[in-house]
């Protein structure tokens, strides 16, 4: 790309050296730089890109964007100094990839819980009604039904996001469903993306180690909505959960058309006459266009909210007949690792769920309680080097179960015994055990169980690894549960 065109939107404080004519790529990782690249120095939580300029130049960078002067041979590379490289990288990424979001309908979904399920349902509704789609979030990057990459974060970095949108647009995609995390918003990973529809699921206790308070957490989440009017080139719509305690906070800070959904409060899209079954949920959908009978394979009240959010989001933008959307809902698959029931031996009912917050765990357990014939056994853990205040609340939520196994999701660098002790502090009864090894915890749950027991393995969903210190160690809850079940009950 022409270098002058690329940097034209930057706020440049100083330029040292002659600009190269063209730039072949952009990177903030000095190890991924190639010939004729632009390297941008980002100050992260653990490393500072300004310290890796020499390596970037050695690998082929011909232009360096930084916040301060660095040791650089300007005969080899040009130095551009800007006030804020986090904002600069968003501008550069959008420009380099030719602002793909301007020509896409992008659904952004944020909230503490439900982002993956709602984006999955939105994606299904769109593809089922013959629209070309991309899905971006916790489970990776998908165009139509082809999976292109996995993801380490709910919201990828700004360069990756723009590149994914660029690839999607080039492959004929017209609509994108995208998860939007609070970290992604706070760290500017979504700057430069022109969202069309913003959907709010709910807000509850999470990430307070990072945000400090629920008020700061909400202020970060609401950025998705307050920024909708910045790009006036599209009709923008916000879809809000009328039943959530933070509804009015989001409503007051949203400068575009608002559509509401809910169960208990009056809303534009409302579910009533809800019936829960072992393998499905049904309800009557009340809308401005009349009422419709909805059937879904998804379980629990929280999934009724997820279905409502998705239907409202798609209908208000696409005007697809509600009869068609309701029909499509019947075929919506359960997202992997989201209240996913395993086909296991031993006549045990084993569910894998990503629930890793007190609110999500409570809702997952409540969705199973009506079908409890014998015992409910819950495996619950939490991660190291993360919000400690959430730990006793998770154990308290799990205490509804007949037997609880406390374990660890991703210990990272923290002492596992400290994590387990924090969890124990929230237990309300003595029918529990602590097992540091997550595989052993899953095995204990299955071994302790009897026929017709329900086993909920919560916290990691479909994640294929555990983070132990700096290493990712292969681990998948569903795979381990099936292995243990088949080993313990081979002939049942």
From Swiss-Prot:
One of its GO terms (biological process) is cell division. Carboxylation is probably crucial for Mg(2+) binding and, consequently, for the gamma-phosphate positioning of ATP. Gene3D superfamilies: Mur ligase, C-terminal domain (3.90.190.20), Mur-like, catalytic domain (3.40.1190.10), MurE/MurF, N-terminal domain (3.40.1390.10). Keywords: ATP-binding, Cell cycle, Cell division, Cell shape, Cell wall biogenesis/degradation, Cytoplasm, Ligase, Nucleotide-binding, Peptidoglycan synthesis. GO terms for cellular component: cytoplasm. Its EC number is 6.3.2.-. The modification N6-carboxylysine is found at residue 221. GO terms for molecular function: acid-amino acid ligase activity; ATP binding; magnesium ion binding. It is found in: Cytoplasm. ATP binds at residues 111-117. UDP-N-acetyl-alpha-D-muramoyl-L-alanyl-D-glutamate binds at residues 30, 154-155, 181, 187, 189. Pathway: Cell wall biogenesis; peptidoglycan biosynthesis. HAMAP family: MurE. Catalyzes the addition of an amino acid to the nucleotide precursor UDP-N-acetylmuramoyl-L-alanyl-D-glutamate (UMAG) in the biosynthesis of bacterial cell-wall peptidoglycan. NCBIfam families: murE, PRK00139.1-4. Belongs to the MurCDEF family. MurE subfamily. PANTHER family: MUR LIGASE FAMILY MEMBER, UDP-N-ACETYLMURAMOYL-L-ALANYL-D-GLUTAMATE--2,6-DIAMINOPIMELATE LIGASE MURE HOMOLOG, CHLOROPLASTIC. This is UDP-N-acetylmuramyl-tripeptide synthetase 2. The gene is murE2.
């Amino acid at each position: 790309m022409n270098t002058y065109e690329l940097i034209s939107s930057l706020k440049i404080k100083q330029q040292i050296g002659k600009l190269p004519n063209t730039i072949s790529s952009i990177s903030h990782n000095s190890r991924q730089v190639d010939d004729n690249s632009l390297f941008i120095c980002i100050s992260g939580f653990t490393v500072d890109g300004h310290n890796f300029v020499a390596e970037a130049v050695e690998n082929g960078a011909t232009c360096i964007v930084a916040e301060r002067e660095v040791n650089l041979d300007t005969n080899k590379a040009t130095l551009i100094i800007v006030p804020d490289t986090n904002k600069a990288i968003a501008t550069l990424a959008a420009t380099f990839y030719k602002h793909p979001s301007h020509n896409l309908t992008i659904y952004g979904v944020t909230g503490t819980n439900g982002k993956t399920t709602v984006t999955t349902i939105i994606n299904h509704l769109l593809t089922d009604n013959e629209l070309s789609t991309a899905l971006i979030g916790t489970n990776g990057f998908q165009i139509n039904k082809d999976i292109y990459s996995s993801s380490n974060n709910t919201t990828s970095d700004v360069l990756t996001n723009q590149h994914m949108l660029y690839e999607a647009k080039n492959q004929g995609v017209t609509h994108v469903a995208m998860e939007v995390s609070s970290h992604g918003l706070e760290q500017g990973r979504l700057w430069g993306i022109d969202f069309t529809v913003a959907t709010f699921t709910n807000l509850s206790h999470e990430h307070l180690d990072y945000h400090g308070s629920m008020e700061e957490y909400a202020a970060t989440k609401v950025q998705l909505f307050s920024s909708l009017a910045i790009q006036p080139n599209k009709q923008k719509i916000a879809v809000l959960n009328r039943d959530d305690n933070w509804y009015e906070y989001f409503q007051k800070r949203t400068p575009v058309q608002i559509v509401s959904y809910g169960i208990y409060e009056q809303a534009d899209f409302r579910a009533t006459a809800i019936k829960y079954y072992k393998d499905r949920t049904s309800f009557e959908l009340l809308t401005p266009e009349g009422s419709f009978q909805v059937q879904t394979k998804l379980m629990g009240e929280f999934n009724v909210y997820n279905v409502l959010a998705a239907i409202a989001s798609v209908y208000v933008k696409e005007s697809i007949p509600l009869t068609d959307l309701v029909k499509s809902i019947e075929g919506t698959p359960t997202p992997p690792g989201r209240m996913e029931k395993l086909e296991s031996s031993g006549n045990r009912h084993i569910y894998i769920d990503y629930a890793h917050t007190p609110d999500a765990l409570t809702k997952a357990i409540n969705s199973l309680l009506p079908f409890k014939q014998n015992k409910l056994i819950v495996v619950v853990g939490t991660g190291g080097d993360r919000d400690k205040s959430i730990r006793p609340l998770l154990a308290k939520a799990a205490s509804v179960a007949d037997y609880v196994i406390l374990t660890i999701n991703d210990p990272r660098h923290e002492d596992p015994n400290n994590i387990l002790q924090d969890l124990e502090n929230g237990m309300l009864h003595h029918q529990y055990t602590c097992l540091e090894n997550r595989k052993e915890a899953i095995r204990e749950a299955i071994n302790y169980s009897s026929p017709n027991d329900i086993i909920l393995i919560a916290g990691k969903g479909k994640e294929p690894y555990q983070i132990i210190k700096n290493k990712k160690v292969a681990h998948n809850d569903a795979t381990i549960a099936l292995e243990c079940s088949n080993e313990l009950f081979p002939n049942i």
